[in-house]
């Protein structure tokens, strides 16, 4: 019988049930220990990045190659007919006739949802403006499960740009579906989490990392995104910096893990990298396994793995 993820559009993390989240993570864990070979041979996947990306684009493309599939696409829309005035719908309609799935990153919120309305192949949202980034959330959940052994009964700090940061928007939506999670929202007032996202959360609001750090199981740091800031808010760019002095023995829980969607600028000092709490590079590496799992499940109807 065909499983529920087969040919499914991945637009929002809310599109996935807890059972589907577990299926993707279990498959990623399996692939991490047992690399897949030619599972998607003769499959062609489009990587359409209308906005700059390093980790997301390259981890998707590495995942595609490791699955035995082929990838076509672009990393900048200036090299496409969009730069000549072609509409997004015309571009993607044509691309969808060549491929089995489309990965899209776009600066406009809602672009992947729009594409899903007319493309006959699965659409995967690789980030749409300040809205969502569901595949980043999948690797975040996988990293939390890997380090904490659970996705419930956690104390989670979200720090930095909570207003424009799409990664924290998706992660909050996902973790709020698991029981007894408590959220500590740490940001300047100008960059606080949008009200619709916090309305149903068990949360508290804070303006410094130090005041909540001793309580946390997970600290999810984010970059203050200057490219999305209004000029009057640009002074906030370096407002939240985590340093080694904040992580001395006895000051934090032994199971604390620090995550970051990357790229970082200066919000995490380099000396933090060598502490046992830093997990952001392992988190980034997990992106390839999660994206392998997602593509394999979307494009294989029988999913012959756990």
Swiss-Prot record:
GO cellular component, one term: cytosol
Binding site for L-aspartate: 84, 166, 223
Pathway listed: Pyrimidine metabolism; UMP biosynthesis via de novo pathway; (S)-dihydroorotate from bicarbonate: step 2/3
Keywords: Pyrimidine biosynthesis, Transferase
EC number of this enzyme: 2.1.3.2
GO biological process, one term: 'de novo' UMP biosynthetic process
Pfam family, one: OTCace_N
InterPro entries: Asp/Orn_carbamoyltranf_P-bd (IPR006132), Asp/Orn_carbamoylTrfase (IPR006130), Asp/Orn_carbamoylTrfase_sf (IPR036901), Asp_carbamoyltransf (IPR002082), Asp_carbamoyltransf_Asp/Orn-bd (IPR006131)
Binding-site residues for carbamoyl phosphate, renumbered to this chain: 55-56, 105, 133, 136, 262-263
UniProt GO molecular function: amino acid binding; aspartate carbamoyltransferase activity
UniProt catalytic activity: carbamoyl phosphate + L-aspartate = N-carbamoyl-L-aspartate + phosphate + H(+)
SUPFAM superfamilies, sorted: Aspartate/ornithine carbamoyltransferase
Record's function text: Catalyzes the condensation of carbamoyl phosphate and aspartate to form carbamoyl aspartate and inorganic phosphate, the committed step in the de novo pyrimidine nucleotide biosynthesis pathway.
Subunit structure, as described in the record: Heterododecamer (2C3:3R2) of six catalytic PyrB chains organized as two trimers (C3), and six regulatory PyrI chains organized as three dimers (R2).
Recorded family membership: Belongs to the aspartate/ornithine carbamoyltransferase superfamily. ATCase family.
PANTHER family the UniProt entry points to: ASPARTATE CARBAMOYLTRANSFERASE, ORNITHINE CARBAMOYLTRANSFERASE, MITOCHONDRIAL
Record-linked HAMAP family: Asp_carb_tr (MF_00001)
Designated name of the protein: Aspartate carbamoyltransferase catalytic subunit
């Amino acid at each position: 019988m065909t499983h529920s993820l087969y040919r499914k559009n991945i637009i929002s993390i809310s599109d996935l049930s807890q059972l589907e989240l577990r299926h993707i993570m279990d498959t990623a864990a399996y692939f991490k220990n047992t690399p897949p070979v030619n599972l998607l041979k003769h499959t062609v996947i489009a990587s359409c990045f209308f906005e700059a990306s390093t980790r997301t684009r390259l981890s998707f493309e590495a995942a595609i190659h490791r699955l035995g599939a082929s990838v076509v696409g672009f990393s900048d829309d200036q090299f496409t007919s969009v730069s000549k005035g072609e509409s997004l719908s015309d571009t993607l309609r044509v691309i969808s006739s060549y491929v089995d799935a489309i990965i899209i990153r776009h600066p406009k919120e809602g672009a992947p949802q729009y594409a899903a309305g007319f493309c006959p192949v699965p659409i995967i949202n690789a980030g749409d403006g300040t809205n969502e980034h569901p595949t980043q959330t999948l690797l975040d959940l996988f990293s939390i499960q890997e380090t904490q052994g659970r996705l419930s009964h956690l104390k989670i700090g979200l720090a930095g740009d909570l207003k424009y940061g799409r990664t924290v928007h998706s992660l909050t939506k996902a973790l709020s579906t698991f029981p007894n999670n408590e959220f500590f929202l740490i940001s300047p007032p100008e960059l606080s989490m949008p009200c619709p996202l916090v309305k149903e959360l068990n949360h508290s609001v804070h303006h410094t990392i130090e005041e909540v750090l001793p309580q946390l199981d997970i600290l999810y740091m984010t970059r203050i995104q200057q490219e999305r800031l209004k000029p009057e808010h640009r002074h906030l760019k370096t407002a939240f910096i985590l340093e080694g002095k904040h992580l001395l023995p006895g000051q934090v829980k032994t199971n604390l893990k620090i995550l970051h969607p990357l790229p970082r600028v200066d919000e995490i000092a380099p000396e933090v990298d060598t502490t046992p709490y830093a997990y952001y590079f392992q988190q980034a590496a997990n992106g390839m396994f999660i994206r392998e799992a997602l593509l394999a499940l979307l494009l294989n109807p029988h999913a012959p793995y756990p």
